[in-house]
């Protein structure tokens, strides 16, 4: 009887140890964000910041390290080729606003990233690949010209005066000769603006880009 009790105790201890050691599949990384946004387009900072959360059923699980990889394509990231940044294994519990530290990022280009974490109960696998798009990084990259009335609305009106029309509808027809893989629109307006493509509105923004003192600063989306 004593031997049976000892054997049962050993079995229970082994089962308990198995339950306390999570596998890499049970440690998942979720809610990956760049500049606190999900797969954003139009990031205009040279060193974007990454954030993520750890999801696991195991109690008392805390992050002890992370590793981030960034590439110009999802394919390069999968095979770890032509990486623009590989942070290496960093011993840190930081999971918010980790700044990009790789090669210089180009304006108007898409990038792809992933992260895996190390915890006090083991390491996880690579997260799903996420993406973000860079915007215009300096004034020299803005090539567009203002469109609207060619002259002041009323004789003698000053530049900062009100215009005659409360709202304007401007149309620009164009054709593309090649298959479109990716297209990004940068739009700015003095006041609220909405954009439609082939009759369909392309965003749900309200009062975009945003109010400002137009004689000194104009935002864009």
Q: What label would you give each PLM region?
A:
Residues 164-176, 217-221:
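Short beta-strands within extracellular/lumenal beta-sheet-rich domains
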Residues 97-104, 197-221:
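Beta-strand-rich ligand-recognition modules
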Residues 23-59, 129-139:
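Pro/Thr/Ser/Gly-rich low-complexity, intrinsically disordered linker/stalk tracts
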Residues 18-19:
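C-terminal motif of bacterial Sec signal peptides marking the signal peptidase cleavage site
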């Amino acid at each position: 009887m004593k031997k049976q009790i000892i054997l049962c105790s050993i079995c229970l201890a082994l089962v308990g140890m198995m339950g306390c050691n999570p596998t890499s599949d049970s440690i998942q990384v979720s809610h990956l964000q760049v500049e606190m946004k999900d797969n954003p387009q139009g990031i205009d900072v040279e060193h974007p910041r990454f954030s993520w959360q750890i999801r696991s059923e195991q109690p008392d699980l805390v992050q002890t390290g992370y590793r981030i990889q960034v590439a110009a394509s999802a394919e390069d990231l999968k095979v770890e080729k032509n990486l623009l940044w590989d942070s290496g294994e960093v011993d840190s519990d930081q999971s918010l606003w980790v700044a990009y530290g790789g090669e210089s990022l180009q304006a108007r280009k898409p990038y792809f990233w992933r992260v895996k974490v190390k915890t006090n109960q083991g390491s996880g696998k690579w997260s799903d690949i996420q993406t973000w798009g860079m915007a215009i990084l300096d004034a020299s990259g803005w090539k567009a010209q203002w469109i609207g009335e060619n002259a002041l609305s009323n004789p003698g009106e000053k530049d900062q005066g009100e215009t005659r029309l409360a709202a304007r509808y401007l149309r620009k027809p164009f054709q593309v000769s090649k298959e479109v893989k990716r297209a990004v629109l940068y739009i700015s307006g003095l006041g609220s603006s909405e954009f439609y493509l082939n009759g369909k509105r392309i965003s749900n923004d309200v009062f975009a880009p945003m109010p400002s003192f137009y004689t000194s600063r104009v935002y864009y989306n």
